[in-house]
Amino acid sequence: MLCLPVFIILLLLASPAAPNPLEKRIQSDLIRAALEDADMKTGEREILNIIDSISDVAKQICCQITVDCCVLDEE
C-alpha cells in the first residue's frame, strides 16, 4: 500500500518535467546576462570618437600619398 505513493513520488522526481536546480540556475544566469547585454548601447559620443579617429588616420594616409588632402585641412 505504501509502495505505490512512494513509487509515484519517485517517478515524478525522476521525470524530465522536474526542473534540475542547477540547470534552472544556469538558465536564469544566462537570461540575466542576455538582458544586461541588451541594455548596453553604444553612446553617440563613443561613435563620434571612433569616426574622428578613423578620419584622422585617413588624413594621415592621404597626406603621405598626396598633398591635396593636407592643403584642404590647412585652409
From Swiss-Prot:
Quote the subcellular location field of this record: Secreted
* Keyword Cell inner membrane in annotation: no
GO MF annotation: an example = ion channel inhibitor activity
What does its PTM field state? Contains 2 disulfide bonds that can be either 'C1-C3, C2-C4' or 'C1-C4, C2-C3', since these disulfide connectivities have been observed for conotoxins with cysteine framework V (for examples, see AC P0DQQ7 and AC P81755).
Query: Can you give the propeptide residue ranges?
Result: 20-59
Q: Which Pfam families match?
A: Conotoxin (PF02950)
The record's InterPro entries line, in alphabetical order, gives:
Conotoxin (IPR004214)
Q: Does the keyword Lipid biosynthesis apply?
A: no
Per the record, what is one GO cellular component? extracellular region
Signal peptide (UniProt feature, chain positions): 1-19
Q: How would you summarize where this protein is expressed among tissues?
A: Expressed by the venom duct.
Keyword annotations of the record = Disulfide bond, Neurotoxin, Pyrrolidone carboxylic acid, Secreted, Signal, Toxin
Q: Where, per the database record, does this protein carry Pyrrolidone carboxylic acid?
A: Q60
The similarity annotation says: Belongs to the conotoxin T superfamily.
Q: What is known of its domains?
A: The cysteine framework is V (CC-CC).
Name of the protein in question: Conotoxin Vn5.6
Which organism encodes this protein?
A: Conus ventricosus
Q: What is the lineage of its organism?
A: Eukaryota, Metazoa, Spiralia, Lophotrochozoa, Mollusca
